[in-house]
């Protein structure tokens, strides 16, 4: 009598990355196969709220602790969180075998609608078109959303397209962008059982 074989348990896709400069001290811990739990402290309330959307809608367990030169402004903190988050995602993804690779999502919030498309291509690039209706959202400079996603794309080695298709409220615009990013990321990071152990590229590498 033969014993049925069982599939090997996949290795947990977790990472911890720290970044320490004269401007910021940041630690990111994540589990790509989590349930959306978050512990976030950047000193910028609205930014924490947006990072929470990534965790919740991306089903990523996310712990980000950041201290930065907020007496100047939020630029270094937001950009460096994006960089460190990108590095952590790249580390957790590993060789990309079995990865769906591509992800996309549309997310509405009242009058606002955003679309995000992501490709774990190994070729960093960001195309972002979000005409924010206000320069500030609470204490968050809306221009810094670009810096966050630029830092992420460059260090996660992804191609990222972000478009706000409509919106009259800057808070709604930002929230749809971050939620759509989370949903697209969640899709791209899924492991496809039909291509387990296979890198999703005809080149054989990414």
Swiss-Prot record:
<dbReference type="InterPro" id="IPR000807">
    <property type="entry name" value="ImidazoleglycerolP_deHydtase"/>
</dbReference>
<dbReference type="InterPro" id="IPR038494">
    <property type="entry name" value="IGPD_sf"/>
</dbReference>
<dbReference type="GO" id="GO:0000105">
    <property type="term" value="P:L-histidine biosynthetic process"/>
</dbReference>
<comment type="pathway">
    <text>Amino-acid biosynthesis; L-histidine biosynthesis; L-histidine from 5-phospho-alpha-D-ribose 1-diphosphate: step 6/9.</text>
</comment>
<keyword id="KW-0456">Lyase</keyword>
<dbReference type="GO" id="GO:0005737">
    <property type="term" value="C:cytoplasm"/>
</dbReference>
<dbReference type="InterPro" id="IPR020568">
    <property type="entry name" value="Ribosomal_Su5_D2-typ_SF"/>
</dbReference>
<feature type="region of interest" description="Disordered">
    <location>
        <begin position="1"/>
        <end position="21"/>
    </location>
</feature>
<dbReference type="GO" id="GO:0004424">
    <property type="term" value="F:imidazoleglycerol-phosphate dehydratase activity"/>
</dbReference>
<protein>
    <recommendedName>
        <fullName>Imidazoleglycerol-phosphate dehydratase</fullName>
        <ecNumber>4.2.1.19</ecNumber>
    </recommendedName>
</protein>
<dbReference type="Pfam" id="PF00475">
    <property type="entry name" value="IGPD"/>
</dbReference>
<dbReference type="InterPro" id="IPR020565">
    <property type="entry name" value="ImidazoleglycerP_deHydtase_CS"/>
</dbReference>
<keyword id="KW-0028">Amino-acid biosynthesis</keyword>
<keyword id="KW-0963">Cytoplasm</keyword>
<comment type="similarity">
    <text>Belongs to the imidazoleglycerol-phosphate dehydratase family.</text>
</comment>
<keyword id="KW-0368">Histidine biosynthesis</keyword>
């Amino acid at each position: 009598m033969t014993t049925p074989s069982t599939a090997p348990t996949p290795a947990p896709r977790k990472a911890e990355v720290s970044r320490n400069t004269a401007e910021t001290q940041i630690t990111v811990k994540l589990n790509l196969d989590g349930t959306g739990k978050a512990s976030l402290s950047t000193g910028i309330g609205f930014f924490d709220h947006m990072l929470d959307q990534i965790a919740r809608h991306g089903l990523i367990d996310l712990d980000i602790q950041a201290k930065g030169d907020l007496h100047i402004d939020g630029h270094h903190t937001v950009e460096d969180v994006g960089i460190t988050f990108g590095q952590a995602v790249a580390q957790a993804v590993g060789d990309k075998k079995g990865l769906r690779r591509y992800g996309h999502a549309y997310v509405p919030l009242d009058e606002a609608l955003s679309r995000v498309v992501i490709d774990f291509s190994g070729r960093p690039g960001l195309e972002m078109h979000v005409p924010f209706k206000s320069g500030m959202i609470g204490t968050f400079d809306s221009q810094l959303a670009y810096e966050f996603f630029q830092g992420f794309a460059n260090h996660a080695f992804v191609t990222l397209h972000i478009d706000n298709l409509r919106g009259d409220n800057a808070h709604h615009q930002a929230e749809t962008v971050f939620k759509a990013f989370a949903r697209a990321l969640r899709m791209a990071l899924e492991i496809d059982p039909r291509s387990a152990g296979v890198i999703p590229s005809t080149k054989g590498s990414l």
